[in-house]
């Protein structure tokens, strides 16, 4: 059964029809089992895929009505239409036809050897064989291959036969365009081209159709001119001399070869073939056949002998040097290959066989990729639906990874015969899309787990921002000012206006800019450390039940999901920290003022601080204002970054690396996407800090540092525009508002201190000493009365003396205050040791102290366990500050 491959108008059969035909001739049972084989028929595709490239293609060219179809029908058992001389002589084959050779004929390996031997035993066969042995010897330019080394296969590979339209026909006239197109088409697919030539026309140009040979030489030279063309892909030209009646074929074959060389020399060749012979482009073979009518008894054995050249790999003249089709096109891809080649030929495009093979590989790989991806997505959708219904799926990643490997193996199995570079490219694309589909399902599960983890870690992370800010305020509060000229004590005493005194004292202080910038860096470093501690706890193995809740068993059994949850949690915590810092920067003035109030009303150890004198308050105001200004420097640029977590990273990766890491494709993608939160400055960011001068001027904005986008790296890297939270105008505005709020708070504090003081006139104490001198001497000279007075003062006037001592600490000179405090501390320690030293009851007191210590040790573990699970939100509670209380008291007083 033959198929009209190309009609007389140059239309090629569709890919669907070609695939149906190939399925029919390769697997007739598959075609007959259904109504028709379709392109989507799985059995038909499997039959074609099973053959792969294990087939061959033979084509025939020659003059019109030269017996081409007759030769093919006898040689291969085909049913091509032949000329009916009784009706007329003219064009019979129009375009091109394709059929499969009948491998049941004698001469093919599937036939019995005895049948072949019997048919070759006649004298006529001997005569034909002698002629062809002489023809083979005369073809000195053709290299003979030792095909006998190949073992006979168990089944004969399909042999496809192409019958092309004859040349030099009346119907086409002088139009050789279609002839050239068919020649190029035949060379693009056929392993062997049979040139059908009459023996009596040897030595002639037109009668021997040497113009056809010239066309074949030119188009094959065109194919070979491409740089990526493979030199070993040379087609075989089998010149068959028909109706040969002479005894010695050598003179005729020498004439044919000379004609070939003449044509070759007359062709314009590229530089790489300038000195090459025709053997560089073709394997030349020759065969002579007796007269079809006059030597009928010799003609048929000659046909059977020639058939062995095509069907018997043990034959010395076997034409196919490889079992595979020499173009390397799998049979299931042949329809697409023929379509692409014919389209390029018909549109006068440059036909590049390697490019066509690559296009075919792309087409086939794309089909296989789409099919496997569709199958995997259908498989994954089942598990995704189960997750939507709330099921908890253990080892989900392992199931998806196994199916992914199955799909990839199926893809490689379908495309193993195509261009390896193209297959590798599409395999990478398929792997990427399969991993994306896998992670899409895993993300649905991981996000639910991450939400549970975030609900347990978010308060701690947000509290870490507050804790880092408290540490910053504590360090900034104790940061000394640079040496500078300040107001003298006399000038401060002479100031009558409290507001002017406070402003003058504040403005005179000069800040240590490098030290302040160092505090800013310590703030971000501390914040990064706090957040990474939380992330490390999330990554720890075994998973923590107080973090994962009901998912703890699932996480313990699914390492890939655990890594994915860790990535989601890390990214989410980073965004939450950034959101918190951004909100603090949006209200920078309030954040600075809160830091000022805390520094003013709390000591460096966190205890509340109260002022007894206005001078002590004025001394504390500059340090508190400096703390707020340092907070401004910390908020104007976000300095944490999400960077890729390397395999040798410590911290987060240590806990993960301590366990067996999964090696699946999805796990490698998850590990590749893993990040860690770090504080790091590039060269530009290291200089992108506010510069501080004095408290009465706003910090200087770093204008000299370049600002770039986040994707700039290397030498172009600068401060990232998205990380700048405050502009120069925003900094100045926040600073001015901060100064106003600090001045107002300082006024309230000063008024509160002034209102709380109980002052006596300066002349009262000297008057008491003068007027009560006799009474004072009487008390001093009477021991009993002196003891009574001391006891009364200690009991009833203790708070008065303590307040006076605090006032002395705040207002007294440091040269007197510090030695006095040292002496008092030493005396109190000595007195305490003397009181504890008692000979009698010492043992009893020691036992009581030991019992108290033991009781404390018993209570400590319980206290520690409670602290571990205490509500993190309690850490955000703020102790009411003194300024608020004083503000309310002042308002009531004004009312």
Curated annotation (Swiss-Prot):
Quick one: where's region Disordered? 839-895
UniProt KW keywords = Endoplasmic reticulum, GTP-binding, Hydrolase, Membrane, Nucleotide-binding, Transmembrane, Transmembrane helix
Biased region (Basic and acidic residues) positions are 839-861
Lineage in the entry? Eukaryota, Discoba, Euglenozoa, Kinetoplastea, Metakinetoplastina
Q: Transmembrane ranges?
A: 760-780, 784-804
The protein in question is named Protein SEY1 homolog
Bias regions of kind Polar residues — which residues? Answer: 875-884
The record's similarity note reads:
Belongs to the TRAFAC class dynamin-like GTPase superfamily. GB1/RHD3 GTPase family. RHD3 subfamily.
Where is the GB1/RHD3-type G domain positioned along the sequence?
52-323
**Which residues are on the Cytoplasmic side of the membrane?**
1-759, 805-895
Provide the membrane-side ranges marked Lumenal in the record. Answer: 781-783
